[in-house]
């Protein structure tokens, strides 16, 4: 009798373990969010947003990106594929086609697209050919035909990188609706069309951006656009800037845009219901691009960025309440919150002379090479720390590619603001285990990276008149990101051990009971 009881108990435990496997994974990426943001601003957060996830889940306080450049594109691709840029090859929105010798957008078709005069709900001209590494969403879909994946972002590139080449992928179109591309589907499903017909996005865009609190409750003090009252008043603070005639641009640059994406995410969750049928497994990816937009425009030390986080926290709380209301058993959902990368601090004297002028660097370097080897177009261009040389010109002058690369690296190191310059030949010839060069090597893809990889000095950024801060450096303010995993029976805990962002995808794959993405060789996080 005791033996039968023990066997029955073991069977019940085994069944419970199987049932504990989540049927829905919600992956939330707050673009540009640094690891310390939740702790820094927790005094004004509500209990049901960021603090709920931190209180009920596993918080990894030492999660890093171990590669450079730490761009948004590289971060999203690493989160999605579970491998570093050296493998997945995505580190910028722009790459250089060696055949055409010109810059191309990685998610756009290179050949001209004949756009229809009639506006379509499904957009043309997009391609997923650059996304060669399998994503977590694609791995989930490959494990069963019944599984489903939905990815939502403000920007098309963010959505496409997270989704990969399969599944449902939506972003905010220039018309202000949620749209997709022909490479994903030929027409929008009814639940998306119904949301667009409600014109909720237009309602969110007309909302005025005002400070949520009085000035004494903010940690930051610098402000550019919004008015913050020193005392409580019946009259709410409001933004100095007028709403643009193009209301879509406002939706992409105001905190209310985060609310819009969470409202659409609720519809996505409803479209996935019921969640527990035929052992199905479903993934919902949400990328919030607006935090990065605001951080780059105003700086992470601005009241604008701080106020946006408070609004985002409220929107997140509302979404989590809705999400858990749909699931009678919370173990059936696992929620992951992380970031693609941090953002650089804003220098007090952040003028043009303190920036790295990429165009000026290209021109001066080309003049240097022309004086040394003969007049010609030696430089193709520069993007996200990668300098591309014109190989056709180098070979036509019968010069060694490695020699020209070395000359460029030596020249770059003499340029103000450059901390490190290493050639592609050096990265292919040796293995570096520590320091800046090791990070650059992990971000170097032989097929897509440039001829010389450049790292700037701390807090120095590239010249861009529309941004006061950006990511991409080798330093901790860009590499140190938040990571919280909540649900699926995970016990609340604060984990101080060091982990990396390429471990997230294989860890979630194990939690969900599916094969890890094909290119991922990172260790599963133990907890």
Residue ranges and their predicted role:
Residues 5-14:
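Sec-dependent N-terminal signal peptides
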Residues 23-34, 53, 79, 140, ...:
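Beta-strand elements within well-structured catalytic alpha/beta cores of enzymes
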Residues 37, 251-277, 291-333, 508:
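A long, amphipathic alpha-helix that forms part
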Residues 38-88, 148-152:
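Short, structured active-site-proximal loop/turn typified by the sulfatase FGly-forming signature C/S-X-P-X-R
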Residues 51-52, 133-142, 384-421, 497-523:
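Non-catalytic, well-ordered alpha-helical segments in soluble enzyme domains
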Residues 62, 71, 94-123, 175-176, ...:
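Secreted, luminal/periplasmic, and some membrane-associated catalytic domains
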Residues 83-84, 90-280, 289-296, 416:
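His/Asp/Glu-rich, glycine-adjacent segments
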Residues 360-401, 470-512, 526:
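Substrate-binding rim/cap in mid-to-C-terminal beta-strand-loop elements of soluble/periplasmic
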């Amino acid at each position: 009798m005791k033996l039968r009881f023990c066997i029955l108990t073991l069977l019940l435990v085994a069944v419970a373990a199987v049932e504990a496997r989540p049927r829905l994974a919600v992956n939330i990426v707050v673009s540009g969010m640094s690891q310390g943001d939740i702790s820094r601003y927790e005094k004004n957060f509500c209990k049901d947003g960021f603090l709920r996830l931190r209180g009920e889940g596993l918080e990894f306080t030492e999660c890093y990106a171990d590669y450079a450049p730490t761009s948004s594109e590289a971060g999203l691709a690493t989160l999605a594929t579970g491998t570093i840029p050296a493998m997945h090859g995505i580190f910028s929105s722009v790459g250089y086609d060696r055949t055409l010798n010109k810059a191309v957008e990685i998610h756009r078709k290179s050949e001209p697209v004949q756009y229809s005069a009639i506006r379509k709900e499904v957009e043309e001209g997009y391609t997923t050919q650059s996304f060669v590494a399998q994503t977590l969403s694609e791995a989930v879909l490959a494990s069963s035909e019944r599984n489903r994946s939905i990815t939502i972002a403000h920007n098309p590139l963010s959505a496409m990188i997270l989704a990969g080449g399969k599944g449902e992928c939506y972003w905010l179109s220039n018309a202000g609706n949620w749209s997709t591309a022909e490479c994903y589907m030929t027409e929008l499903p009814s639940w998306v069309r119904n949301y667009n017909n409600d014109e909720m996005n237009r309602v969110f865009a007309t909302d005025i951006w005002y400070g949520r609190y009085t000035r004494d409750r903010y940690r930051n003090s610098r402000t550019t656009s919004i008015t913050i009252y020193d005392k409580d008043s019946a009259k709410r603070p409001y933004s100095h800037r007028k709403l643009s005639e193009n209301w879509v641009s406002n939706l992409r640059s105001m905190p209310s845009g985060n609310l819009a994406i969470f409202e659409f995410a609720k519809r996505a969750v409803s479209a996935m219901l019921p969640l527990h049928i035929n052992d199905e497994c479903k993934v919902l990816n949400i990328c919030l691009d607006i935090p990065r937009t605001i951080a780059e425009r105003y700086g992470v030390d601005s009241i604008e960025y701080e106020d946006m986080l408070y609004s985002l926290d409220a929107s997140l709380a509302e979404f989590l309440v809705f999400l858990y209301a749909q699931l009678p058993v919370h173990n059936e959902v696992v929620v992951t919150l992380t970031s693609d990368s941090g953002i650089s601090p804003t220098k007090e004297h952040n003028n043009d002379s303190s920036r790295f002028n990429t165009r000026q660097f290209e021109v001066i370097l080309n003049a240097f090479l022309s004086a040394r080897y003969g007049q010609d177009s030696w430089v193709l261009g520069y993007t996200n720390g990668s300098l591309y040389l014109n190989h056709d010109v180098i070979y036509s002058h019968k010069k060694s590619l490695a020699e020209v690369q070395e000359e460029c690296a030596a020249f770059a190191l003499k340029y103000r603001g450059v901390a490190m310059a290493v050639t592609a030949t050096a990265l292919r010839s040796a293995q570096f285990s520590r320091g800046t060069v090791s990070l650059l090597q992990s971000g170097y893809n032989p097929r897509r990276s440039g001829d010389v990889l450049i790292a700037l000095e701390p807090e120095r950024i590239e010249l861009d008149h529309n941004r006061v801060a950006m990511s991409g450096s080798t330093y901790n303010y860009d590499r140190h990101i938040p990571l919280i995993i909540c649900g699926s029976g995970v016990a609340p805990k604060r984990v101080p051990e060091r982990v990396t962002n390429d471990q997230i995808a294989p860890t979630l794959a194990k939690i969900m009971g599916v094969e890890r993405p094909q290119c991922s060789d990172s260790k599963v996080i133990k907890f």
